[in-house]
Amino acid sequence: MLAEKAIGGTEYQKLYDMLSQFLGKKIYAFMPIEAGGVNSMLPIAAAARLGMPMVDVDGMGRAFPELQMVTFTIGGMKATPMALTDEKGNSCIFETITNKWTEELARAVTMSCGASVSVSLYAMSGKQMKEYGVRGIVTRSEQLGKAIRTIKDCGNRTPEEHFLEMSEGFKLFKGKIADVLRETRAGFNFGKVVLEGIGEYKGHSAYVEFQNENLTATVDGEILATTPDLISLVDTETFIPVTTDALKYGKRVMVVGLKCFHLWRTEKGLELVGPRYFGVDTDYIPLEERCKGGN
């Protein structure tokens, strides 16, 4: 969407003013709500524009498609008040009875505003952030980015071995994209990417289901990974992640699983982001157990 509908540039100051006035308190710092996609980068721009610090923490340790899907919800924190504005200057503040309602109302407004808005939410104390935030996630993202940029400088290891070591990932499959099925419903991108095995996986098949983010990875009919563990498709040569909107026929990818933040494996965490929440008829089993040691 941002390729067609860019950020205006005044949203950061407007959100800061709206939320601080509503709270009657000074806001001391920003943080990204998730470590994936543009939502990991905009808080950096906001902090730079307003001359304020950004904390090295987020609420997911990855990306999830809905606003209530954060570790702060596990801790009982409210998403609201939530300030919302678009690039035209339309704005509002929501107070909702649950974080799920925050998601529902924000998505409805977002679709009316052209499928892209800027929001500020989950105001909290430093103590709450320390207790429930995923610490060091920005630094971790920088480290992974550096590992990908220097993938050819890996000594006596192959680039693939270097990538898996740096990411602490489990290699689930390697294949060529044979088909991509997509459908847009209720403001989400649903779909499935089908893979034909290459290399050591030749003769095997796999598919990955997604709702904005990848939800399950299935190889030869056996589920090898599910949400909340992270499932990533990376280019087999550059090892740059391939987002769901960039999937296309013929592209060669490696399917990699990464362990999620420990709070997602609790009962409350799985209620929010476990496979059954997304309609997947399977119980959550940790990635490392499904892979029996993995790669």
What are these regions (language model features)?
Residues 143-197:
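Oxyanion-binding "anion nests"
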Residues 1-28:
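Glycine-rich oxoanion-binding loops at beta->alpha junctions
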Residues 26-39, 53-55:
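A short, small-residue-rich loop immediately preceding and capping a beta-strand
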Residues 69-109:
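A structural-propensity feature for long, helix-poor, extended segments
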Residues 113-126, 154-174, 262-268:
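Flexible, glycine/charged-enriched surface loops at secondary-structure junctions
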Residues 12, 33-44, 61-65:
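Short glycine/serine/threonine-rich phosphate/pyrophosphate-binding segments
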Residues 48-68:
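Short, acidic/small-residue loops that bind anionic groups at enzyme active sites
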Residues 180-295:
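C-terminal non-catalytic interaction/assembly regions of soluble proteins
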